[in-house]
Amino acid sequence: MIRQAVIMAGGLGSRFGGRTKDMPKGFIEIDGIAMVERSVQKLIAAGVEEIIIGTGHCYEYYDGLAEKYHCIRTVRNENYQNTSSMGTLEVCAPFVKDTAILLESDLLYDSIGLFALDNDSRKNVILASGKTNSEDEVYLETDENGVLSGVSKNKAEIKNVAGELVGISKVSKEFLNKMVDFYDKTRAENAKIDYETVFKKIAKDDPIYVHKIEYYAWTEIDDEAMLTRANTLIYPRIKENEELRKVQREVLLNPGPSTTTDSVKYAQVVKDICPRELEFGNLMEKVSEDLTSFVANPEKYTTVMFGCSGTGADEAMISSCVPPDGKLLVVDNGSYGARLAKIASVYGIETDVFKSSTYEPIDLEALENQMKSKKYTTFAVVYHETTTGLLNPLEKICPMAKKYGMTTVCDIVSAYAGMPIDMEKLQIDFGAATSNKHIGGMAGIGFVVCKKEELLKQKDWPMRNYYLNLFDQYKYFEETKQTRFTPPVQTFYALRQAIIETKQETIEKRFERFTECWKILVNALKEIGLKMLVKEENQSHFITAILIPETPAYDFNKMHDFARGQGFTIYPGKLGNIDTFRIANMGDIKPEEMRRFTGILKEYMKSIGVC
């Protein structure tokens, strides 16, 4: 698993003439996307967390790209006109922490090459292809062990061609440091040396291997002829290859698990690893830190993770966060609030339930009267009641609970990573969530974001639950970077990728996307003549509960099958004697997909005489 990449992008691109006078050649577009941006997208999809771009000519373009992709760090090679790729790599090297992917900026390539390098067990590896006939080949020679022994554009200088240099490599931090040391010592005579030539120099003492993909689809683009070749010959091959690896798209409009990106799905395809290895412990530690940082200050809060569903996280929270002699007050204004109360009853926790309408706002005055009527130690509420899409005003409710001395435990399962949340500002002490809703991971990891001060109070409390005990899990993880019991390994890799993609989009922009999808749906419902259960001003923008049409011709199963046949999954919903169906805006749903769905919905409703 490689966390960093370095793109060497300092060159002038002079072989393009006027085209690159005022623009780096990495910004030449193929099918509407700049080469370097396409590369950035592929690196993110491959799980790279930070991309360092060494810039020079027209560096402002790359600085602008960094504003769009938050994982990019630009480093300027001030002397780019008098150096070559090694000079640019030198200025980037101090920011490389571990093994990194090195790339040139003017490459068009099949993303499978990144997968091949990541899955090569050797520390230092050069990606090579078979014969390309590009007329700008860099030939590689290897010894009997596959170690690089020669690099040249002159084929006559190579005894046996092992492959052609692609311009994508994997190097360790130690190998990179040796490259920089060599360059520093020989700068006077080697100012314009290329990085691949330095590979050969270092390989004499520290091996770098060649990984050849015979029929690999790629090209470097250095001039107009290469650009024409890329557009007509290479890009169509790359596009076809990558299209073949796409997973069939099913848009889940159910309230979780949500639609995931292909990169999240593929993130599960990793080498087998014992979860007790330090490497995996480090991954879980980083995931925990990132999950915390989305909603709270990691210095004051921490995230405790379990192999379980969101309900498992709720159970961990309820069973762990009420003191032995404590009393719990639960708000029930939907199925998920009722579930919190049910969990408490199973554990024999003394509990009062504040019943509220499932589709109208909570009566805050009545709730406060309930809070002050008895001495409660703990208060539990659902932020986004997924049954209906009703958003409870935690910004008012939790401070009210704190006023009466209660610890606040909140189900934030269907709000986490879908909307901006500041747990400290909202005065939430514990928040339960899951890997398979707005965060965009796969089902299987439940977690509780905990205020450390409150969590530490549980140290000497008797355990009501063994597997789901918050403090025991927290303590063990702090000491070992391990969960007490076997974690869902592949699901953690998928969650790591989902976190990378959440950081890139940002939660604020994600909420905007969900809101746009919600508006498209609401406008379509009005046009069709269908009514929503919850008033618009009280909706979360994540779930819309829709009253079923008053006609005997309506059949949810037939509507479901009609939508499913066109790639959309919908979900029923029933509240007592109120019949509804629900449409969710979660996960990797796009506005254009919601438009397509509303067209399908209109078509079905028209077929039964509703519109």
Predicted regions and their residues:
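PLP-dependent enzyme catalytic core of the Aspartate aminotransferase-like
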Residues: 579-611
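Active-site phosphate-binding strand-loop segment of PLP-dependent enzymes
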Residues: 361-415, 430
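Conserved alpha/beta core of the MobA/IspD/sugar-nucleotide pyrophosphorylase nucleotidyltransferase superfamily
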Residues: 2-5, 164-244
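Conserved N-terminal alpha-helix of the aminotransferase class I/II PLP-enzyme fold
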Residues: 267-316, 320, 335, 339-343
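Active-site C-terminal subdomain of aminotransferase-like
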Residues: 259-260, 436-523
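Conserved core of the sugar-phosphate nucleotidyltransferase
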Residues: 110-188
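Conserved PLP-binding catalytic core of the aspartate aminotransferase-like
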Residues: 531-562
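Conserved N-terminal catalytic core of the sugar/cofactor nucleotidyltransferase
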Residues: 1-7, 15, 33-100
